Design a protein with these regions (language model features):
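Short, charged surface segments at domain edges that flank catalytic/cofactor-binding sites
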Residues: 1-31, 88-90, 94-102
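Histidine-centered nuclease catalytic patch
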Residues: 32-62, 71-78
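A detector for short metal-coordination/catalytic motifs
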Residues: 58-59, 69-102
């Protein structure tokens, strides 16, 4: 059997592939919200889906439910600058993540 002939479990079960993807997003920040540092419980779209954002690794970051809900579909850069936990160096990281692939 060649590797080209192999069937991978992720291909048979899309939910498993999604679970691995979500886990990799959360691992990026040590399972912490990229905005406030609390435990991440959700995935936030830097460019909201309602404004054309895709569910891609480049557009998704780990977020706590509070930050994800409060940000809603607001511009991430405008929203983040208004937060009491705003950190200029983290702002630059978020900016770099978002603009690396746009």
């Amino acid at each position: 059997m060649h590797i080209d002939d192999a069937v991978f479990l992720e291909d048979l079960c899309p939910k498993l592939k999604l679970r691995y993807w979500r886990k990799s997003i959360h691992t990026f920040t040590g399972k912490r919200c990229i905005y406030c540092g609390k435990p991440s419980e959700s995935i936030d779209h830097l460019l909201p889906q309602s404004k054309g954002g895709l569910s891609t690794t480049e557009n998704c970051v780990p977020a706590c439910l509070t930050c994800n809900g409060n940000k809603s579909d607001e511009n991430v850069f405008y929203w983040y600058r208004k937060q009491k936990f705003y950190d200029p160096s983290l702002y630059l990281l978020i900016y770099a993540l978002h603009h690396e692939h746009t």
